[in-house]
Amino acid sequence: MLPRPKGFVINLAASPQRLDSAKAELTSAQIEPIRVDAFDGREIDLAQFAAYDDDKARRFMGRSMTQGEVGCYVSHQRAAAAFLESGDEIGFVFEDDIALQPEFKTAIPQVIEWLCGREDWHCVNLGATRLKITSPVAKVAGIEVLRAHYFPMLAHALIWNRAGANAFLAASEPIFCPADNMLRQVLTRSDMGLATAQNLVTAGR
């Protein structure tokens, strides 16, 4: 039997109710919730934040990043690092405003078991709403898993393996775009991204 998976939940200290809600969702799905202290970008001066490259951001997006975007990005760095520090082979990363769909709870144990037997992936997006340039890989517990050649946006529900989290962190600085944009760049380059055809986790509750 596989060990109970951990879900690393990105959460600001000022939002305990959101953490409680996320914990209840994950516990009901037999996932151990682990809080990751979110980075509050509102407290930083981007002009003095060494990891951020404003010139590169302007070249890439035509504008500077917002403090909130930088905060979300650093929070995803922290979550990937926390997963690696756990020593686990596979881990979930969630933002704290998630809601699990019924299919998540029924299918995810088999999805995890299926992923554990493969090395041809780095990250799975469980919450994408728009998929572009994909090819079918397998149907697991009734859920279609796709190769996301153009990794989808939204990063509120991810599954990492160790190779993927390491690859993301290695490429993650300087910061010049939102976290989901960087995920798209890293995973499209490697072609090691997967996604579920239906979003199993929604956000914004």
Could you describe each region identified by the protein language model?
Residues 1-94, 98-205:
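An acidic/histidine-cluster motif and surrounding catalytic segment
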